Amino acid sequence: MSLTDVLELNKTELFAKIRNGLPVVQRTQNLLDCKDDLLFAWHAKDSCLLVRNWRSSLAAKVNIQFQTLIPSSLVSLEVDRVLASNEGSLVALSGPRGVVIMELPRRWGPDGYYKDGKPVITCRTFGLDTQLFLKNPHLEVRQVRWHPHSVSDSTLLVLLNNNTIRVYNHSKLRHVWQVGPPVLRSGANNSLCDFGELAVDFDIAPAAKPRVTEPETAGNNETTLDKSNKTLVAAKSLPKQERIEWPMVVLRENGNIYILMTGVDSENTRLQGPVTITPQAHDNYGLESCALMIIPSLPPTIVIAESNGKLHHALLMEAEATEHSFNEVDDSVLIEPAEYVVHVLETVELELGISAPATGKEGGNCPIYLKRDLINELRYFAYHNAGLHAVTVSFIAELQRYLESESDEDRLELAVSASAEYILCTKFDSSETVNAVFGLALLQIPAGIVLLLGSGQVISLKLVIDAQLLVTPNENKPVDSEVSQQESGPPFVDTIKSLLQRSVNQPILADKLSSPSAQESFELLNQAIEVLREQYLKRHDLVRAAFTRHINQIQLKKEQQLQEIQDLEQERELISERAHKLAERFEEISYNQELLVRKCNALMQRANASLPNSVIAEREFSQEVIRLNKVTQSLAAGLETAKKTFNKQRYHIAQSQEDLKKNAYELPEKQHRTITEILTQLTGEIDRQITDVKRINKIVGI
């Protein structure tokens, strides 16, 4: 099993067929998508959708390699994006010149394929506003998203380059929402493109309750609705129940952010902006903005991507008061004061390719596409012409912990910055050749990713769901160790790990479309040598210096501790000698004290006995005590003698019993039985005689 293809998808017939029909133009697109256990792949050559159950295909025996879903109508557009709906009932096939929706058939069978694994299935398809794109050759699709809260799982939002979002329900156009000034490809309106006023991306934030608008603003809204002939519809659609709006965050090319407030299926919209971005920056956080994504945290997190590789992480928060914005380029679009503000917390700069430092060239600019990880909300993926990055937004976990904390003294500290891991690199030289990412699909349970490159190579990797779930040796430390760690400083192992921590990632290098030239190989070698020198050898020198300092400190402490041990040994010997002398002195003093006590008692007795006023009873009592003492001593001596005699006799008795046991004569069994019977008869005879004697005595009266 290859380390870069754990699912062994390169050997499958599906990707062998995809490899033969890849697009010629090398630009980043997404021809892959995954919904539950089904992997969708667009075959550009045959204009059909290939489906494979990647989870069941992990088994040893696979009956069905893949299924082919043929559109019922001809798909003439160049598909660059495959997007399955939330419930997996529809698939949107999007390209620069149109959008096609394909209805997926029902699933049944042991492996969960469509129509019990039928190899080829014709699916109903319908194009969206085909005539609109034919009549407007400059019209292009910028973004396509399924509404996450559509009841029928069929609401599709399409952003066009004329600053409009078209809302479709299956094949029917429901609404057209204006998110900017109308764009015409003639006259002075071309300046909109120059000033970056075109919307490039949008995403849907979590639902919010509509605010109560001011009377003046309400009057202006009514006037605008009258112009659009929507007053009656708005009056009829005012239910008494509480309304819910979905903020749609729209990103323009110049970095300005607008918010379109509307319902899931509502004709009434409120465009707000440009939203104030804090802290202020001279480039407005992106003069070359190309992508936007919202992570549904609390508050929502906005990710803004620039084509130069910068990613801005910000929070979308409600403003304390509505902020009035400047007049729009076109007065035909009514823009309300913004109810939100965007606060940028950090900026992450991606490495767009690996190039040799000697060339002085960077990865250059290329569009960046964002894809959110549905399993881990702290992580998302950024893919581009130079490969794939996995970005972890750490402050979301801090926000969640702070919101869940019940302590009033808990403070919010967003000290941990985001981390960007370069997973796959497809550009590692200064040439203009590009091996773009043609598809990215995220797998669930087990978590993984599948990438399709322009060279036809398929990369399949397993992912850790959450890095915080990994057990580290630093976890489950006792409380006492924290105090000792504060006194002694960080562990030396952690210090070495921090010194060996590289500032750049070493991604997987993808295969090139052709064999590299000598110049490209030389650049790659120089880059590898530079990375080895800067990120490995230099850090090893730092580690060696740290080891030298640590060894010197340990030797110094060792010498000091040995000297202290010698001093303590001397002190111990002195203390032992003193303790021995004190013990002898104590025993001597105790013995002398006991003698003195005895002498004092004897003197007291003599003094009491020799007193002239001593009564006769006391003298007699003292004499009796002396006599009893002598008698007691004689009795004790006699008792001791009796004990010795008793022990001696018991010993002789035991010896005699052992001798009797040894010299005992055992009768034969027959004789023993005969004697036993005779004794039994004699016992019975004696009992009868005793009974007769008692009877006679009773008669006689004795």
Swiss-Prot record:
GO terms for molecular function: chromatin binding; structural constituent of nuclear pore. Residues 542-594 form a coiled coil. Keywords: Chromosome, Coiled coil, Immunity, Membrane, mRNA transport, Nuclear pore complex, Nucleus, Phosphoprotein, Protein transport, Translocation, Transport. It is found in: Nucleus, Nuclear pore complex; Nucleus membrane; Chromosome; Nucleus, Nucleoplasm. It comes from Drosophila melanogaster (Fruit fly). One of its GO terms (cellular component) is nuclear pore. Its main location: nucleus. This is Nuclear pore complex protein Nup88. It comes from the Eukaryota.
